[in-house]
Amino acid sequence: MKTKNRPPRRRAPVQDTEATPGEGTPDGSLPNPGPEPAKGLRSRPARAAARAPGEGRRRRPGPSGPGGRRDSSIQRRLESNERERQRMHKLNNAFQALREVIPHVRADKKLSKIETLTLAKNYIKSLTATILTMSSSRLPGLEGPGPKLYQHYQQQQQVAGGALGATEAQPQGHLQRYSTQIHSFREGT
């Protein structure tokens, strides 16, 4: 059987029964030195009886009466949950749209988010490599450093390579990596 571990009840300090003149009741008389227990030791009904007739339980002031703060807190939490649910729904829809665009063979198995992003990244790189290969081969006699697209691609590769510490010499490496990855998904690994 599981028991609750509760801390011991705090007791009010024992009050000194000897009162000095001027202490005690507002009119200066001494309080009743009867056997009344300290405030913390009285029973619940005794405390309720000792309370003034107009005095009720303490309530926190709220925006719309008692419990209003709690209601507004619950309402804010519900609204926050709904916003998060909508955000996740939009994100999942975007991933599904990306899965439909990326060519992969295994239609019976849904790609995970990380697989989808990795395939998309490598697919974009392979398409870029293909475009660069096609555009540079169709421009015979180009004496400059190459078309603007190819220059931009080389700059991006140098920046990315410097940040990551490794560069690929040829854009064909991206195509090879993408086709290898597609093959591994085809095999089911």
From Swiss-Prot:
The UniProt record lists the keyword Nucleus: yes
SUPFAM superfamilies, alphabetized: HLH, helix-loop-helix DNA-binding domain
GO terms under cellular component: chromatin; nucleus
Alphabetical UniProt keywords: DNA-binding, Nucleus, Phosphoprotein, Repressor, Transcription, Transcription regulation
Feature: compositional bias, Basic and acidic residues: 68-85
Domain remarks: Lacks a classic transcription activation domain and instead possesses an N-terminal region capable of inhibiting heterologous activators.
UniProt-recorded name of the protein: Class A basic helix-loop-helix protein 15
Gene: BHLHA15
